[in-house]
A protein has these predicted regions:
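Amphipathic alpha-helical repeat scaffolds of TPR domains
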Residues: 268-286, 302-318, 341-359, 368-371, ...
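Alpha-helical repeat scaffolds
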Residues: 290-297, 324-337, 364-377, 404-413, ...
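Disordered, acidic Ser/Thr/Pro-rich linker "stalks" and the adjacent N-terminal cap
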Residues: 493-561, 572-578, 598, 633-642
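Trp- and acidic/polar-enriched beta-sheet ligand-binding modules for extracellular glycan
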Residues: 547-552, 561-562, 573-642
């Protein structure tokens, strides 16, 4: 470990001004391990100089484990140029002082150094974790750990300030600058949209000593909180397409999930760290084969360390290892990361392995390599990821159009039965080969063979595909796939009469349910038509029928958060009693529900007015006691709050 510290410190290792600091550091094994085994150590001289600065001002921190860990985390996060030493000093001082006064969440004391790095880094907006902001937020929002996923709503969602200035322009906050102690206080009074609300939620958690981070999504900002040991919960989130603003390795959710899984095995992290340090030292001594063996030992101990994998693969490239070495490494990598972490495995293969071996490989060999990876997938693993980009990348490297079509056809046979991968694969092929009649014909034949029916060709394929894929996409919260397949299948049905033709007045606002997804109890039962589910949430209409039982239910997942003005439900003439006494519940996360209304009496049309309370939600659930439910239309109206 001492050699590793020397390499990290650079020239300052031999600087007599730091002699006492290095003596204190090297005399404390726990401190050395916290520094070296808590994720990447980058910009080493700057990291070490800052840690020395903190120790020089307060040598006692070395004997206070919590403060020592926080100081180390602050130093490690100075790896990036967008944080300066004085700013980070104030961060350390805040946590040291508030911990001493017992003002932080009790989880703070139990955090490991790698988790404290998220406290040190802070959210996207640096001003939201200034000392003034942190103190304000801790005083204003001091809740149980799990509740910070709702802290974003302390600020109102407002697209325009009281003067009518848009949040998209600089004038939105300009009149109020200097009137408040800090930006979070100003936002609570003035308002904001997704960026401000997400930073509010993450900064509030951080102010109380709870790890959190902000992240970008398509057209939206969200955040995540470590709501329990080892559990990161997305908050104010609309999509699996997340770009993290704070990360140990890559800024993807899958990479973050892998880091948590790795650190859950703390003893393995430390043992693998020792082997990795040995490998680096042996390579520096020119003992390449021994270094190779040490790296393999490190990865055998802990194959979930993404940073170690990158180092080892670069080691192989640096020393021009042969094809057999790369094949063995592929096997070890896939055994370590699949099926639980397919995104990380794919990125490592694409960026580091295939770049070294595909150049001279035949189409047959390339296809074999890709199929070896794909065969080990079992659903999404740790979460939905951009597998479409992987399919595109492979497809471009398996030969001409005929060979590409054959590759996809074979993959379709293997993927179609997967409830996770099947729907997005069908959606991807439909888009990718939209103008290729030969490919579409081949795909239709495969789908027909799966349904074991014959008849109407393309329409039958579409109907059977939607019948299977729409419930699967809704269950996976994959709104993109639900929308793509649902819209395609909608041409199989005539639209229902418009609300105007039926004499029904919509509620104010926009149709929030448009673009969402519908889940029901036991889809595909003998009365249900899953291929018509998409239209239920649109004015054109569709149909669904729950199973018969003690408590039938259905859920609507909105494509964004909304303040709900009202809900319109259309029943079936002659069976209007199916909605009587049903309860309407709303939720922000699909887990915790609040009842907001009851359907009174038996009617063909229900118009549920929620304008007095305007509940904020992303999920709507309708349930009743006994029998079943079926509605051709469930239309949710209101105003966006994301």
């Amino acid at each position: 470990m001492v050699w590793s510290l020397e390499q990290t410190a650079g020239p300052m290792w031999n600087d007599p001004r730091f002699e006492d600091f290095f003596e204190a550091l090297t005399g404390n094994e726990a401190w050395m391990r916290a520094l070296l085994d808590s994720g990447p150590v980058e910009n080493g001289p700057r990291v070490m100089a800052f840690l020395a600065r903190l120790w020089t001002e307060d040598p006692g921190l070395a004997s206070r484990p919590v403060d020592r860990s926080m100081a180390t985390a602050c130093a490690l996060e100075l790896r990036a140029a967008d944080r300066d030493e004085d700013w980070m000093q104030s961060r350390y001082d805040y946590f040291r002082d508030h911990h001493a006064d017992a003002l932080l969440n009790r989880c703070y004391e139990e955090l490991e150094t790698w988790e404290r790095r998220f406290l040190a880094r802070g959210p996207q907006y640096t001003s939201w974790t200034s000392p003034e902001s942190l103190t304000f937020l801790r005083e204003r929002i001091c809740w149980p750990r799990s509740e910070y996923v709702s802290a974003c709503w302390q600020a109102p969602y407002r697209g325009f300030n009281c003067f009518g200035d848009t949040v998209q322009g600089w004038l939105y906050y300009h009149p109020f600058r200097g009137a408040f102690r800090c930006d979070p206080e100003m936002t609570i009074e003035v308002g904001g949209v997704c960026g401000a609300l997400s930073n509010m939620g993450a900064a509030a958690a951080i102010a109380n000593g709870i790890p959190a981070l902000t992240m970008g999504e398509p057209g939206h900002c969200a955040y995540a909180v470590q709501t329990a040991p080892g559990v990161w919960t997305p908050a104010y989130s609309l999509s699996w397409k997340r770009g993290l603003h704070s990360a140990l390795h890559r800024r993807t959710w899958a990479s973050h999930q892998l880091a948590q899984a790795s650190f859950d095995r703390r003893a393995s992290v430390l043992a693998a760290g020792d082997k990795a340090r040995l490998a680096r030292w042996q390579e520096a001594q020119g003992e390449i084969n021994r270094a190779d063996a040490a790296w393999r030992s490190a990865l055998a101990i802990n194959g979930l360390d993404e940073g170690h994998w990158v180092e080892y693969l670069r080691f192989g490239a640096r020393h021009d290892r042969d094809a057999s070495w790369w094949r063995r490494t592929i096997r070890l990598l896939q055994e370590s990361l699949l099926p639980d972490h397919p995104e990380v495995a794919w990125v490592l293969l694409k960026d580091h392995v295939f770049a070294m071996i595909l150049g001279d490989a035949s189409v047959r060999d390339r296809t074999t390599l890709f199929n070896q990876y794909l065969a080990k997938l079992e659903g999404w693993g740790s979460g939905r990821w951009n597998i479409e980009s992987a399919w595109n990348w492979m497809l471009e490297r398996v030969g001409d159009e005929r060979q590409q079509r054959q590759f996809v056809t074979n993959l379709l046979r293997d993927s179609i039965d997967s409830p996770d991968l099947g729907p997005p694969f069908i959606s991807w092929t439909s888009s990718r080969f939209e103008d290729d009649e030969d490919a579409r014909s081949a795909f239709e034949n495969i789908l027909l063979s799966k349904t074991r029916r014959s008849g109407e060709g393309e329409d039958l394929v579409l109907r059977q595909m939607a019948k299977t894929m729409l419930p699967a996409a809704a269950e996976a919260h994959d709104l993109e796939t639900f929308q793509r397949i649902g819209k395609a299948a909608s041409r199989l049905f005539e639209p229902r009469p418009s609300l105007a033709e039926a004499g029904i007045e919509p509620f104010p606002g926009i149709l929030l349910s448009s673009g969402g997804a519908l889940r029901i109890w036991e889809p595909g039962n003998r009365w249900d038509s899953p291929e018509a589910h998409w239209g239920v949430l649109e004015e054109r209409g569709g149909s669904f029928h729950t199973q018969v039982g003690d408590k039938p239910w259905f859920e609507v997942e909105l494509p964004q958060f909304g303040e709900i003005e009202g809900i319109i439900l259309e029943g079936r003439p002659g069976q209007a009693h199916r909605g009587a006494d049903a309860r309407i519940l709303v939720s922000r996360d699909g887990v915790d529900w609040e009842q907001v209304a009851t359907l009174e009496g038996a009617h063909v049309w229900y118009r549920v007015d929620l304008s007095k309370t305007r509940p904020r939600a992303r999920f709507i659930r309708v349930e009743r006691d006994g029998k079943c439910m079926h509605f051709p239309r469930v239309l949710v109206y209101g105003r966006r709050s994301s």
